Amino acid sequence: MKKLILASLFLILTQALFALRIGDPAPAFTAVDSHGQQHSLANYKGKFVVLEWTNQGCPYTIKHYQSGNMQSLQRQWTAKGVIWLTVLSSAPGEQGYQTASQENEYLQRAKAAPTAALLDPNGQLGHLYGAKTTPHMFIINPQGQLIYEGAIDDHPTTDIADVPNSTNYVAVALTQATSGKPVATTATRPYGCSVKYR
């Protein structure tokens, strides 16, 4: 029991020590998408990048996809040159785990429009960024720095009716950043289902 407590304390302290901070360089990664293509953060230097942690079985994620909110954001910003990477970190056997073909079918059915859907079943990318919930959003600027992390909006509910009345932190941050303005709200508390790591 004592060893378990010490191990837990070490994990908490390690996570706190290496927690991402706004303005820090975003951690480098390479991941494979649902079509088998590799994506490296380094390849997108000079572009804004959005990382969206998702889980199609999570009611909070469902809220943003059934309302069309997430797809609308994806289309709006990828049309402006933003790279939008949806990340699936659910482990095999856990809620939200998808094979490549299952994810491609889901993306088509949901009319989703990310640049790519990255498969992260071992949770390596999720742990690298400290992704806690679905959705959990991160924005990286063209210089490779983290400029926003947290919730998608200010209504932490599963109610689709709340979407039109919400302040969308991601949309606001991207609008400000792509206009050359400082991002006013750089970090918020993410809400949603916990990421289903093993």
Q: Whereabouts are the PLM-identified features?
A:
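Cleaved targeting-peptide boundary
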Residues: 19-27
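Short active-site neighborhood of thiol/selenol oxidoreductases, capturing the structured segment around
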Residues: 42-63, 174
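Sec-dependent N-terminal signal peptides
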Residues: 4-13
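Short, internal strand/loop/helix patches
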Residues: 104-141, 146-147
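Sec/Tat signal peptide C-region and signal peptidase I cleavage site
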Residues: 13-19
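Thiol-/selenol-based redox modules, centered on thioredoxin-like
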Residues: 139-198
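A short beta-strand-turn-helix
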Residues: 29-49
